[in-house]
Amino acid sequence: MNNLTSTKFIFVTGGVVSSLGKGLAAASIGALLQARGFKICLRKLDPYLNIDPGTMSPIQHGEVFVTDDGAETDLDLGHYERFTGVKTTKNDNITTGKVYHNLLSKERKGDYLGQTVQIIPHVTDLINSFILYNTDALDFVICEIGGTVGDIESQPFLESIRQIGYKLSKNNTVFVHLTLVPYISATMELKTKPTQHSVKELSSVGIQPDIILYRSKIPLSQEQRDKIANLCNVSPTNIIPALDVKNIYELPISYHQYNLDTQILKHFNITSPEPNLDKWENILNISHISTKTITIAIIGKYIKLLDAYKSLIEALEHAAIHNKTKLSIHWIDSRSLNNEITNTFDNVHAILIPGGFGDDGVEGKIIAIKYARINNIPFLGICMGMQLAIIEFVRNVIHLEDANSTEFNFYCKNPVIHQLPELQQNLGGSMKLGSHPCYLKVDSKIFSIYKEQVINERRRHRYTVNLQYKDLLESHGLIFTGHSHHNNNDSLAEVIELKNHPWFIGVQFHPEFKSDPFQSHPLFMSFVQASLNYQETKKA
């Protein structure tokens, strides 16, 4: 530890409305403290009753972020990893559903010895245990509480952090509250009333915020800050703007400029050298150097909420930044595509099919894959995207037109994609999850990209390639260049490549979960480079 006598806890709550950026605020705090040499971890407490987000609609919840140890978690854990480089685990995300599941399991086993099981103390004790678990070696633990203050679902979590604040005292805890200060364009005014009411709501459960972050387009005046300070019992120096930014990687620098990390350390009476933000300044400088622009088409069915593809978008942005290229994403609803493609892909330099589930929109994705294959457009298929690339190839090159996945047609005659037998149980928590080693063929494009024979990538899938078709596929030019070991040393297909195509790769794993702004993932780097090469070819 950094000469601290005890671990400090930072609790981040939100008010007024959801989606204000609590996760990014928490990640930024972590990055700033880390830049000062402190050892940190970040945790997320989600108030919904699902055990995890694994079976939730991406259009409602956003993406499911998968950790190395196979936990299906909230997308904010992706922000935590990308901002700090600290790998999250199953112990860093808890839900009300998981709390109740553990509680009822303990009750059935008789662990409560005949007690009447109640929210207080039994539910809150479990939440407290989650927050405090394995924290002794850390300088700071940053806990984000999901939802909005005032939500019924959040009450046990707020009570838990209140209890921890009381037990550990203000010397070891700080409460950071993020609110909205809306700008009314008709009167050209910033309105502080929502913040006042949000703090009042938080105070009603016994939590007095120490720092207020206000989300706004422009900073408040000193007079407005004094007003909030007076009505919310918070020092004016601790009322800090969370300003809108063009690039989320500006946030740590922005928060530092407004003294967020300084005020947190002042609260704890901790002295520390100024943070080393060189890598953040460097990434912003690079991001402003874009000599070219490429357009990548992403064909999916969750495009109504782009958070469903959050890590994928960030991974592409990272690769574009390090290729000194501006990225434009052309979002296409897979259900809108049919065989009468006219000029849909005329100005596109690459095509990407991300992961997904179910048969809705599948045929549109297959049409896009065929277009990429025939027209030599760089193509990347991830998870289902790889599986659909195989189906397209078998149908249109090998001419087994009834080829399909048993996910879409259980009784198809040529099931080139099928379900792993041991996973034919419950829908939730029944997939291949987490980081696994993948073995690459040395004489392959994928090896030339990674420059390693054994890689570790995260997976999230229930279906896999039926290897009975492997020889047939390879004899026609679709090559298997990566595999992983399965039960009893059986193999699972992890990577495919198309011969005689400039750049056509499918991967069963999810590389987007391991990209960060400081070290772009090699697969996305190569994909963006291939897009640039294709752009030059089109110009010639």
Swiss-Prot record:
InterPro entries: Class_I_gatase-like, CTP_synthase, CTP_synthase_N, GATASE, GATase1_CTP_Synthase, P-loop_NTPase. The active site is at C383 (nucleophile), H510, E512. CTP binds at S18, D151, I152, E153, K191, T192, K193, P194, T195, Q196, K227. Mg(2+) binds at D76, E144. Coiled coil: none annotated. It comes from the Bacteria. It is an enzyme of class 6 (ligase). Residues 1-270 are annotated as: Amidoligase domain. It catalyses: UTP + L-glutamine + ATP + H2O = CTP + L-glutamate + ADP + phosphate + 2 H(+); L-glutamine + H2O = L-glutamate + NH4(+); UTP + NH4(+) + ATP = CTP + ADP + phosphate + 2 H(+). Keywords: ATP-binding, Glutamine amidotransferase, Ligase, Magnesium, Metal-binding, Nucleotide-binding, Pyrimidine biosynthesis. Homotetramer. Catalyzes the ATP-dependent amination of UTP to CTP with either L-glutamine or ammonia as the source of nitrogen. Regulates intracellular CTP levels through interactions with the four ribonucleotide triphosphates. This is CTP synthase. The gene is pyrG.
